[in-house]
Amino acid sequence: MPDILHRIGMRNTTSLKVYQALSSQIGLSCWWTSDTLGTADQEGQSIRFNFGNEAITIRVLELSPNRHVLWEVTDGPAEWYGTKISFVLKEEEDFVILLFKHMDWQAPVDFMYHCSTKWAIFLMSLKQYLETGTGAPYPKDQKIDNWN
């Protein structure tokens, strides 16, 4: 099964701040989509991310403070259903490194290509949010094609 993989490094932040941006409703709404409902700070919780007429619901599978967040997609686009999204944090020199993986796609369809690019854009929004205090969550994100 194909996966989407990205690596970004962030300066002037801490693993704790990155973890909070990945595991709180407020943090997630500052870099992914401003229309975020629910809580993501405990295992088993669900959170819904709205993107206009589309939505994605995830369940938090694992939380390891300042180190790892793992989600499972429970509702949303058919291609996303049952996939898992992992964020692994580590510190290297004066960077917090984020290793991102959106795994278990059934096939490398056109939508996966689109989502790979959009994940890169949203991860850059996360980096911007943590380094400057202002991200570019949906609907302020960069548009890349006719699907958004």
What kind of region is each of these model predictions?
Residues T14-L16, L61-N66, V88-I97:
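A short, structured loop/turn motif at beta-sheet edges
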Residues S29-D75:
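Glycine-rich portal/gate segments that line the openings of hydrophobic small-molecule binding cavities
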Residues M1-G38:
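Hydrophobic ligand-binding cavity/cleft-lining segments
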Residues M1, N53, A78-W80:
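Glycine-centered tight beta-turn/hairpin loop motif at sheet-sheet or coil-to-beta transitions
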Residues R7-G9, I58-E62, T83-K90:
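Hydrophobic/aromatic beta-strand elements that line small-molecule binding cavities or substrate pockets
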Residues V18-Y19, L28, I47, V60, ...:
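Hydrophobic pocket/interface hotspot
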